[in-house]
Each structure stands twice: as C-alpha cells, then as structure tokens.
C-alpha cells in the first residue's frame, strides 16, 4: 500500500502543549464533528474546531462556551494549533485521513474512531487512543483514558515520518519501475507502453 504523503518538513513539533483539544475538519455531517462537540459539551474541556462547511452554524448553536470555532484557517494557523493542542480529535471514519498524520508530525497524539484509515496511521496506546463506537460515551471514555496515560511526542513524530514525502516518492518510483520492468497491467488496466 502506498499512502498519500504528508509534509513532515512543514509539520514539526515546536513549543509547549496547552490544555486544549483540536478538531480540524470540513464541517459536514459524515465527518462527525457534532460527536466531538457533544462529547466536549459534556466533559467541559476546551475544544478548538477549525474548518468550514454546511454544519458550522448548527455546530455553533449546540456548542457550550468551552468550544471555540475558528472557521477555515491558513496552514500556518493550523500548524500552530497542531503544535499546541494536547491531542487531536478525529471522530469520523476515513479511507486514510491526512490530518491525524499531520498532528502526529507535530508531536501531537490522536484520539480517533478506531475504524478505517486511522487504524493504519495511529498506534493505540502509543501515538494515540481509539474509541470503539461513534457515541459520546465512547469518545468521552477515550479522552479519559488518554488523560491517564503518557504518550511520547517523539514517538508520534517518528510514526508520522513513515508517511513523509520522501518515502512516498521512493515507493512510487519503485512501483513504477517494477511495473515497467514486468510490463504489469494492474487494476485500471493501464497500458504501461503508453503511460
């Protein structure tokens, strides 16, 4: 499997962690940001939400004062929050999910729904914590478990480097060379001769 690359030279650890959690996403229903908002409404911890989308007004309407919405932000602001948040919240199910890897590249652990791509990018108990169901209770339990363990930001960073640009380029080059040498036609029936 060749994973999409993450710019680990841009997303780097820096500064001190603060008592905030971060959720970065397009604010659309399937991303499940409402789950994070409802869970953090109940536990009262500070949650910063970055992103825009059709659910922004709805999410603001249900959020308590401990939840702050910043809307869409440039990469510099995103990186700043990745660096200073205590953990990154990833409540949706994605095929891959770049944001958990960007967070880890900044030395930040991830609290993620334990399905889909997160299971390939986050190491439960090592670089983050999984929750088993997309329910408030399950996410609250994961935050509680996270608060009771110590996660090494250096290990998060090392894990993210497995998804860096250099590795991606190396894997793609090897794959293309292999296909050319073996004149292999794969899933999409690409004509290697005319590729």
Predicted segments with their positions:
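Short alpha-helical donor nucleotide-sugar binding micro-motif in glycosyltransferases
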Residues: 80-85, 172
